[in-house]
Amino acid sequence: MKKIKTIIIILISIILIIIYARFIATSGLITKEYTIYSDKLPYSYNGLKIVHFSDLHYGSVITSKRLKQIVDEINLINPDIVIFTGDLLDKSLKTDDKLVETISKQLKSISAKYGKYTIMGNHDYEENKSEIEKIYKNSNFTLLNNQYDIIINKEKDKIYLGGIDDTLLGNPDIKSTTSYLKENNDTYSIILVHEPDYSTNILKEQEVDLILSGHSHNGQVRIPIIGALYTPNGSKKYYKNHYKIFQNELNRCSCIFPLISIHIFFF
């Protein structure tokens, strides 16, 4: 009888842990702020605010109501640049025109002085790729697929922003993405790549100042003190919030920021 009681207690504990991990631990919205210093940034960009979020997987934990909360929180920060680093929809989600319109409308309401940028994640290639691209277009997010943009403010000072295609299911091309930096390496540079472990490949090819990633969910299965028990492929080495690599910055985001500084906010 005592043995049966013990088994029942263990089973109930496991069920409660699963419920907590699936529905409670994933429901809170936490904003983390980092200040990044660089003497490569022109003075006119002092205090630049970047909001970085990733891996919404809309349709699983994230609902329309939840997305509105995230959008409202982003707009409260009044960001200069907004960056989303892939995996927009849950791969099991069945999409239609109404859903595309709903998500597009919410993401379009995000305001950013210098623009909104995104890249593709591995789940974006598995299902709903065309719908995801349509959402980005409708919501005024610039999709950087082995491409880059040069942000220029009213003082004509520049920041380079490049986005690399997904490294697991896409066709990443570091050379074409970073071609501008070969002749302009004094420009402050930001690279977006969904899988953080690919940062090593990027830095072997080209020196950059800041890399923003997603994918790892800060350790997919994680126990306090012990740390991550499981991380997805592409985030085995780098899965925490912030790393310094060769004096460069790698900031990865879990789904859910007198040298010049950038303030980066993570969700």
Where are these regions (language model features)?
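Short, Asp-centered acidic motifs that coordinate Mg2+ and/or phosphate
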Residues: 80-81, 117, 141-142, 159, ...
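Membrane-embedded segments
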Residues: 44-142
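N-terminal membrane-anchoring alpha-helices
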Residues: 1-44
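Active-site-proximal beta-strand elements of phosphoester/diester hydrolases
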Residues: 47-57, 157-167, 190-194, 248-256
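Catalytic metal-binding/acid-base residues of hydrolase active sites
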Residues: 57, 89, 123-124, 148-149, ...
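Conserved beta-sheet core of the metallophosphoesterase superfamily
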Residues: 196-267
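Short, conserved loop/helix-junction motifs that constitute active-site signature segments
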Residues: 77, 107-113, 181-185, 203-206
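Binuclear metal-dependent hydrolase catalytic cores centered on His/Asp/Glu-rich metal-binding motifs
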Residues: 134, 138-141, 147-148, 154-193, ...
